[in-house]
């Protein structure tokens, strides 16, 4: 009977639906402080969304965060990705490092699950032809190039040494830095390599010292950059020290200690908050500290925006089905904490800005925003 059918249909329609969003980052290992910062950004976004009483396709939606640890290790990263696919997440925010993001992106692509990385900057990530890959930061071609030109034009670097940690991120940003230096007419006098687990840099630094560089660039993360700076001091290498976003953290202040110096370290972070967004970012940082009990370390605002952008696409599509909301994500225009967010046809953020920083009196100080 019609009544029986109506009852059966009503029985199938859940009063509200639970939607799972995945997050992956290094929650253990030497850069766990950055992974946990990212995870906190995701937690805050999910909490905000659940307070907002969102309805999609006529049902109230409750969002759940499924968080995985990739230990900044590519193998662990692909295992975490598979776990999230098996858990039926509708989207993933992550990973933090390019070296984990790139191999995992194939798994999400095969499963048709949208992935937004808050922080993977290696250009290759969005050059694989996957429809599911997005990022909310400028890539290394922009970041490394800007730093390379800055080393020559502003810091007046005549002889520049380059070290990288051989990861997808570190090597990628160092390669782009070298291109930037050469484009500005500068000279790279030495190129050395380490790993992202190394603690002793004496032999490569001794080799570099012989070349008398006035600028040393390091492609890698703060956990290696800090001790490297201290060992440069021990060897009396008085060069300026430069790096990408991986070293551009609050943690570097502790890790480098006295070797940080004043206006000695120069780094850039993808993203740059200009004009009207400055207040928005300041408010976010204050609220983050209150809610999460810690200062923003680096990428938590990007993670927060990535979650919000993903859910905005679901709202526009009136569906949490990845197949249905993915086309909306590709053409989204969203006003985030970090600024306006829209993607090009590869999934790179359009018009990404950069901020250059230095450190003075044990504090990080913004020098300028480059658009």
Language model segments and positions:
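Short, low-complexity disordered leader/linker segments with a strong preference
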Residues: 1-20, 56-57, 86, 370-371
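Extracytoplasmic "Venus flytrap"
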Residues: 22-43, 68-74, 96-99, 163-171, ...
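Extracytoplasmic ligand/sensor domains, especially the bilobed periplasmic-binding protein
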Residues: 89-192, 240-266
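Beta-alpha junction/loop-to-helix N-cap segments that form part of ligand/metal-binding clefts
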Residues: 14, 33-37, 52-127, 136, ...
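Segments of small-molecule ligand-sensing domains
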Residues: 287-300, 309-366
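Immediate post-signal peptide segment of exported/extracytoplasmic ligand-binding proteins
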Residues: 12-25, 54-62, 152-158
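Signal peptide-proximal N-terminal region
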Residues: 19, 39-65, 182-186
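Extracellular/periplasmic periplasmic-binding protein-like sensory domains
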Residues: 229-304, 360, 364-370
């Amino acid at each position: 009977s019609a009544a029986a059918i109506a009852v059966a249909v009503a029985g199938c329609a859940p009063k509200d639906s639970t939607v799972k969003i995945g997050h992956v980052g290094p929650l253990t290992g030497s850069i766990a402080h950055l992974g946990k910062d990212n995870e906190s950004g995701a937690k805050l976004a999910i909490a905000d969304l659940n307070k907002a009483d969102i309805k999609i396709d006529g049902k109230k939606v409750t969002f759940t965060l499924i968080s995985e640890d990739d230990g900044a290790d590519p193998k662990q990263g692909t295992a975490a990705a598979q776990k999230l696919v098996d858990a039926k997440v509708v989207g993933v925010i992550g990973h933090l490092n390019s070296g984990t993001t790139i191999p995992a992106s194939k798994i999400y692509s095969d499963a048709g699950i949208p992935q937004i990385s808050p922080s993977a900057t290696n250009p290759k990530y969005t050059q694989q032809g996957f429809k599911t890959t997005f990022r909310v930061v400028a890539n290394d071609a922009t970041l490394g190039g800007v730093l390379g030109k800055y080393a020559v034009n502003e810091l007046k670097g005549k002889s520049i040494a380059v070290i990288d940690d051989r990861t997808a991120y570190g090597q990628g940003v160092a390669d782009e830095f070298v291109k930037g230096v050469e484009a500005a007419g500068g000279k790279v006098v030495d190129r050395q390599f380490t790993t992202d687990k190394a603690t002793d840099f004496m032999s490569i630094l001794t080799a570099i010292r012989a070349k008398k560089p006035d600028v040393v660039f390091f492609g890698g993360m703060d956990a290696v950059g800090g001790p490297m700076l201290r060992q440069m001091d021990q060897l009396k290498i008085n060069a300026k020290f430069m790096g990408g976003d991986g070293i551009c953290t609050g943690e570097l202040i502790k890790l480098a200690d006295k070797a940080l110096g004043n206006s000695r370290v120069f780094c850039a972070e993808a993203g740059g908050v200009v004009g009207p967004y400055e207040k928005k970012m300041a408010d976010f940082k204050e609220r983050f500290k209150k809610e999460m009990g810690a200062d923003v370390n680096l990428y938590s605002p990007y993670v927060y925006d990535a979650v919000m952008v993903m859910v905005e696409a679901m709202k526009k599509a009136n569906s949490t089905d990845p197949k249905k909301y993915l086309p909306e994500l590709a053409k989204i225009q969203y006003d985030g904490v970090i600024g306006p967010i829209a993607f090009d046809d590869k999934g790179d953020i359009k018009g990404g800005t950069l901020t250059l920083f230095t450190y003075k009196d044990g504090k990080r100080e913004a020098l300028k925003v480059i658009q």
